[in-house]
Design a protein with these regions (language model features):
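PP2C/PPM-type serine/threonine phosphatase catalytic domain
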Residues: 1-259
Length: 259
């Protein structure tokens, strides 16, 4: 989801649901994105990254209280409303990263991939290779992604690492209604003068300086590796009938020196 307001431009990437819980009929990723989009619209233009993250977390937490789910979600983090964001603060001229969204700053890629993803996607890739060696096919595994099923227990349990530096190098920051440690808020000051920016979700494995080029790179990848376990490793492949493996958000804009 893309947010645009006088103070901020942002990409909000709601996490794929890993439970059957619905929030007013919506899956958790979409519900999280809608909540955070609304909350971003209430932020003061001059607020700091720390203040913004705290307010966004509070907005999610308010949903938990209204739904009377706070106690359950304290002990079952995989059921939470969870999202990653990259936010451009116009007034402070900063990029704020919480999670694994990405950006291009005058052509320079800025991203913070999760170490735990390398482990989990590697496990899925290994499982799929073994399935192929035992007689399965890429088409059959696209129809029934047994690799995704294989890692799903890990995907649920890795939520324990959300905003939890006690998890060592495998912990990762997200907005999920609970406190985000300071070190989980990455701030990138923008240089003076005019800058060209691209903000995007991680649904673009190869981020380019135009939407058309990013889409073309994605199509080429999916044509070569639709299961996404060899050329690019993901936690799920592209299912039949779909045009990609993940939601995608992309916005390109110029920030003037006076902005």
């Amino acid at each position: 989801m893309i947010h645009r307001s006088d103070g901020f431009i942002a990409v909000i990437d709601g996490a794929t649901s890993k439970s059957a819980i619905r929030w007013s009929g919506e899956r958790s990723g979409w519900a999280a994105a809608r909540c955070l989009d609304a909350a971003l619209g209430t932020l003061p233009a001059d607020c700091s990254a720390r203040e913004a993250v705290d307010r966004l977390s509070a907005a999610i937490r308010d949903v938990y209280r209204r739904e009377d789910r706070l106690a359950d979600l304290e002990v079952h983090p995989h059921r939470r409303l969870t999202a990653s964001l990259v936010i451009c603060s116009r007034q402070r001229r900063e990029l704020w990263f919480i999670g694994d969204c990405q950006a291009l700053l005058n052509g320079e890629l800025i991203c913070y991939p999760k170490e735990v993803d390398h482990i989990v996607t590697g496990a899925r890739a290994l499982f799929l290779e073994l399935q192929l060696l035992q007689g399965s096919s890429v088409d059959a595994l696209r129809e029934n992604d047994r690799g995704r099923e294989y890692i799903l227990p890990l995907l649920k349990q890795q939520a324990l690492l959300q905003n939890h530096p006690g998890g060592g190098p495998l912990w990762f920051p997200v907005i999920d209604g609970f406190a985000v440690p300071d070190e989980g808020i990455r701030i990138r000051p923008l240089p003076p003068g005019e800058v060209m920016l691209v903000l995007a979700s991680d649904g673009y494995p190869v981020l380019k300086d135009s939407l058309a080029a990013s889409e073309a790179a994605l199509r080429a990848l999916l044509q070569e590796d639709p299961l996404l376990f060899r050329k690019f490793r993901a936690t799920k492949g592209m299912a039949p009938g779909y045009i990609s493996f993940d939601d995608r958000s992309y916005i390109k804009f110029k920030l003037q020196s006076q902005d």
